[in-house]
């Protein structure tokens, strides 16, 4: 059945136009225009990334429960081959200083949402990679066992890392007890680069494509520093509301190891030098 017909049957609306959207590295993404509404449609294989959109829906709902904004979920369904997620389409606007204040407020709402343990009741995805969220008592244990070690193993299996790299990681692990902050778990977005933050009406920040878990909140702060696209002053607003532990700037390179390793696996060896610089430093 053609895609247009599949979606019309689910929405009970006639589609005027279907247009591809950029940013579909993992999913096929479309803008759907009907007589009365505009939607975002995401399509993915049901066999390659099982329950990806179910996990995305749960992540969006968890973020929304904090009071932070996400697109409205319209429908999630599947057929024998594909899974489909239909969301509200967000018309983005240009931003001013108030947007970044609002972003800081929203991020604090996420990060003040806590849990007894680090991790999550279910696994999910970061990009196209499986993310193991088995719960742990300490951030150090979770960071090593659930974040760094799984992607180090994948990178090693792909010949992107060697034995010397593994040895350097082991040396780093022995020092993390003295480096990582001790704070209660925070709900984190988990993949907070600028492409996953939309600029909605009324200077409203809207979070998309979450990879949530309960972790140390500095992982989100780190992601905002990784690729740019965030006003540098937002962190001042954030710190007024929920001050970060002293030394957070120095810990950015440690927390950056996880997204850097994910990018090493997904996009190749251009990320290796930055990883080596950090693990050899310690």
PLM features: residue spans?
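Active-site Asp-x-Gly
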Residues: 132-144, 153, 184-187, 194, ...
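ATP-binding pocket architecture of kinase catalytic cores
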Residues: 19-141
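A general structural signal marking secondary-structure boundaries and capping sites
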Residues: 67, 111-118, 155, 180, ...
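Conserved N-terminal boundary motif of the eukaryotic protein kinase catalytic domain
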Residues: 12-19
């Amino acid at each position: 059945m053609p895609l247009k017909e599949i979606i019309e049957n689910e929405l009970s609306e006639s589609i005027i136009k279907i247009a591809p959207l950029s940013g579909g590295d993992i999913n096929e993404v479309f803008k759907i225009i009907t007589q009365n509404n505009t939607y975002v449609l995401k399509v993915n294989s049901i066999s390659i990334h099982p329950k990806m959109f179910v996990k995305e829906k749960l992540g969006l709902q968890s973020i929304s429960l904090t009071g932070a904004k996400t697109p409205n979920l319209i429908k999630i369904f599947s057929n024998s081959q594909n899974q489909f997620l239909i969301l509200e389409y967000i018309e983005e606007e240009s931003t001013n200083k108030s947007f970044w204040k609002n972003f800081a407020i929203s991020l604090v709402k996420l990060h003040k949402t806590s849990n007894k343990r680090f991790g999550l009741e279910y696994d999910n995805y970061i990009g196209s990679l499986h993310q193991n969220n088995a719960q742990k008592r300490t951030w150090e244990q979770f960071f090593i066992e659930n974040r760094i070690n799984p992607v180090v193993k994948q990178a090693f299996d792909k010949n992107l890392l060697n034995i010397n790299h593994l040895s350097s990681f082991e040396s780093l692990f022995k020092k993390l007890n003295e480096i990582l902050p001790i704070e209660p778990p925070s709900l984190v977005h988990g993949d907070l680069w600028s492409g996953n933050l939309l600029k909605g009406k009324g200077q409203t920040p809207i979070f998309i494509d979450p990879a949530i878990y309960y972790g140390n909140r500095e992982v989100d702060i780190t992601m905002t520093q990784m690729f740019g696209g965030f006003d540098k002053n937002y962190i001042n607003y954030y710190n007024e509301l929920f001050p970060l532990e002293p030394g957070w700037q120095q810990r950015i390179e440690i927390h950056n190891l996880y997204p850097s390793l994910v990018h090493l696996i997904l996009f190749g060896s251009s990320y290796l030098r930055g990883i080596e610089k950090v693990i050899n430093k310690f």
